[in-house]
């Protein structure tokens, strides 16, 4: 039998519809806030579903330089900000002696959907020469992992998980196993998603995966 290492959680970060840090998030949970309201990220007038749980009032400039954030898809910004929060909460430090034993795994179901959608429109209306050279790096699901690893200086195991709604949980599970087997000393892990776009909402609605109770969005989720 392998000699499994004990695994513990040392820090938490959160960018959510009910709070943009762990304290706000816990308070939102305690108050029973669900974060669901009318869509503001785009005009949903032609969509059968007109509400979503959006991340609001996030001050990304507190964590990411403005010039950098323009080159990052929204999902990657969420992932990096939450990772930075969790790392700070943990009290850990990364240096030359331990960097190779600290890794990052962040899951994402669709990655940079907003980037893909906006650049497809540019391609259609303005031609291929106007497509951003950052399109592919911004779009790929592993960009949140890569950017978080660079920002924190983590040089250990690094990968991304793309398993739909289970991506974040799978990222945590994969990290748990690496720690349990002694392949890493610490892992920054979780999930990041930003699929509230015209295409994302239309696609989920067409799949009958969304509620159309637009008159009462706060009570629309009925599992």
Which residues does each predicted region cover?
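Aromatic side chains
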Residues: 25, 42, 63, 75-78, ...
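Generic hydrophobic secondary-structure packing signal
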Residues: 24, 75-82, 167, 171
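Generic anion/oxyanion-binding catalytic loop in active/binding sites
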Residues: 14, 72, 161
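Acyl-thioester C-C bond-transforming condensing/cleaving domain
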Residues: 2-4, 20, 31-37, 88-100, ...
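ACP-dependent fatty acid/polyketide chain-elongation machinery
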Residues: 1-68
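Structured loops at beta-to-helix junctions and adjacent beta-edge loops in soluble globular domains
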Residues: 12, 107-109
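A glycine- and small-residue-enriched flexible loop/hinge segment at structural boundaries
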Residues: 41-92, 141-155
């Amino acid at each position: 039998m392998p000699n499994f290492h004990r695994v513990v959680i040392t820090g938490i970060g959160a960018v959510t519809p009910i709070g943009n840090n762990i304290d706000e998030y816990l308070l939102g949970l305690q108050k029973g806030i669900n974060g669901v309201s009318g869509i503001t990220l785009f005009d949903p007038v032609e969509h059968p579903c007109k509400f979503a749980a959006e991340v609001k009032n996030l001050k990304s400039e507190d964590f990411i330089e403005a010039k950098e954030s323009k080159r990052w898809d929204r999902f990657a910004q969420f992932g990096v900000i939450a990772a930075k929060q969790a790392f700070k909460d943990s009290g850990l430090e990364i240096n030359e002696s331990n960097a190779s034993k600290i890794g990052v795994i962040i899951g994402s179901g669709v990655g940079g959907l907003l980037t893909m959608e906006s650049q497809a429109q540019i391609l259609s209306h303005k031609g291929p020469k106007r497509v951003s050279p950052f399109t592919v790096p911004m779009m790929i699901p592993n960009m949140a992992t890569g950017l978080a690893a660079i920002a924190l200086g983590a040089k250990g195991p690094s990968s991304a998980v793309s398993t739909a709604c289970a991506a974040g949980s799978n990222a945590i599970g994969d990290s748990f196993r690496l720690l349990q087997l002694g392949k890493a000393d610490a892992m920054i892990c979780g999930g990041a998603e930003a699929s509230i776009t015209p295409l994302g909402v239309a696609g989920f609605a067409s799949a009958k995966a969304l509620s159309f109770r637009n008159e009462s969005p706060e009570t629309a989720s009925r599992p």
